[in-house]
Amino acid sequence: MNAVVWWQSLLLVMLGGAFGSGLRFVIGSCLLQRFGAGFPWGTLAVNLIGSFVAGFLLIWLDKRGSAGWSWRMLLIVGLIGGLTTFSSLMMECLVFVRSDRSLMVGLYLCITLLFGLLFVFLGARLGAFVCDDQRVLEIDRTA
């Protein structure tokens, strides 16, 4: 990767990351105000939304070939990277353990991982539908 492309990638990721982080703050604040602090609804919501959108964008942008490269930097690496948060997920698990709510750790992780996988696949299926490509998630039975 040459220097110009590297700097362009960095700027696109930073721009998308700024918007994604801001969006995470807004969603988290709204859900905290609505549902309170008993469960990390904001982190769960942004991680599931991010999973769905990432699945969709991965398929949709892949169909654009090299033309989708800059959009991938901006939207997937930047926006979705800024929106979703693994560190908050882990920190909230630690808070559950320290507040004698250890059972919530398992529930929270299971919900996040299982629904995250479901949402990324649903997003990919929607991307395949929009791109009219039914081969996206098919299993190659010849291998």
Swiss-Prot record:
A GO cellular-component term linked to this record: plasma membrane
Annotated disulfide bonds: none
Coiled coil: none
Domain of life: Bacteria
Annotated localization: Cell inner membrane
A GO biological process held by the record: cellular detoxification of fluoride
Inhibition and activation profile: Na(+) is not transported, but it plays an essential structural role and its presence is essential for fluoride channel function.
Residues binding Na(+), per UniProt: G81, T84
Key word Transport present: yes
Alphabetic keyword roster: Cell inner membrane, Cell membrane, Ion channel, Ion transport, Membrane, Metal-binding, Sodium, Transmembrane, Transmembrane helix, Transport
Catalytic reactions on record: fluoride(in) = fluoride(out)
Transmembrane segments: 3-23, 41-61, 76-96, 103-123
Membrane disposition: Multi-pass membrane protein
GO MF annotation terms: fluoride channel activity; metal ion binding
UniProt keyword annotation of Metal-binding present: yes
Pfam families, per database record: CRCB
Primary localisation category: membrane
Entry function: Fluoride-specific ion channel. Important for reducing fluoride concentration in the cell, thus reducing its toxicity.
Family: Belongs to the fluoride channel Fluc/FEX (TC 1.A.43) family.
Name the UniProt record assigns to this protein: Fluoride-specific ion channel FluC
Organism annotation: Xylella fastidiosa (strain 9a5c)
Gene: fluC
